[in-house]
Amino acid sequence: MIRRGLLSVTAALVLLSVSCSAQETMGCADRTAINDFNATLYMGKWYEYAKMGSMPYEEGGVCVTAEYSMSSNNITVVNSMKDNTTHEVNTTTGWAEFASELHTDGKLSVHFPNSPSVGNYWILSTDYDNYSIVWSCVKRPDSAASTEISWILLRSRNSSNMTLERVEDELKNLQLDLNKYTKTEQSAKYCAGAEHVVGAMLSVAIASLFALLH
């Protein structure tokens, strides 16, 4: 199961994901976002279960969540994470919009006030009620390399084994390497002080990633 799989990631991979800004590859993989995306069903709160790639400022961050709500012309994004050392909760608010005019696929563009860059947010798989697998990749302007990041989002901090098994199957179907994901702390011990805050630094990671690359 994914719970055991993520916990079995080697120490070297864990250290690598913390010290590197994100997963580097030679060119972005040819991936496809879902083509029948229902934005209304996707709204609400999501908990970051695990991520592939990491931003430097995320070190020590726990209880990562993201909350989405529909507004008049876009999607409001409220993100937060709790600093495991200072116990402070950091939040930010941005917005997302469809990357295409059809508004039928899971390709979104994410914007934040303090970032001049736009991050891509591709939903590769979701059942809306339990899980979502999100992916982002951008080619570096100064080389042939690209930077890839991905998140596993769940609707609750403690999801069932059935949901986790479904996620693992979807990762295999998407040809995403389970061992490159590191689990995000979401236990009640660490997250009790963050329950009153809506959101996580999920989309901030995208915005900061693009800021570093431009």
Curated annotation (Swiss-Prot):
InterPro entries, sorted: Calycin, Invtbrt_color, Lipocalin_ApoD, Lipocln_cytosolic_FA-bd_dom
Endpoints of the signal sequence: 1-21
Record's keyword annotation contains Cell membrane: yes
SUPFAM superfamilies associated with the record: Lipocalins
One MF annotation (Gene Ontology) recorded for this entry: pigment binding
Cellular component annotations (GO), alphabetically ordered: cytoplasm; plasma membrane; side of membrane
PTM characteristics: N-glycosylated. Contains disulfide bonds.
Lipidation (GPI-anchor amidated alanine): A192
Keywords assigned: Cell membrane, Developmental protein, Differentiation, Disulfide bond, Glycoprotein, GPI-anchor, Lipoprotein, Membrane, Neurogenesis, Receptor, Signal
Proregion span(s): 193-214
Main location as per UniProt: membrane
Domain of life: Eukaryota
GO BP, one annotated term: nervous system development
Coiled coil location: none
Membrane topology of this protein: Lipid-anchor; GPI-anchor
Subcellular location: Cell membrane
Pfam families found in the cross-reference section: Lipocalin
Summary of the tissues where the protein is detected: Expressed by a subset of neuroblasts, ganglion mother cells and neurons of the CNS; by all sensory neurons of the PNS.
Positions bearing carbohydrate: N38, N74, N84, N90, N130, N158, N161
Similarity comment: family membership: Belongs to the calycin superfamily. Lipocalin family.
Miscellaneous information on this protein: Named after the main character of a 16th century Spanish novel, Lazarillo de Tormes, a crafty boy who guided a blind man.
The protein's role, per its UniProt record: Putative role in axonal outgrowth and guidance, required for the navigation of identified commissural neurons. Could be a receptor the midline morphogen.
Protein name (database record): Lazarillo protein
Origin species: Schistocerca americana (American grasshopper)
Species classification: Eukaryota, Metazoa, Ecdysozoa, Arthropoda, Hexapoda
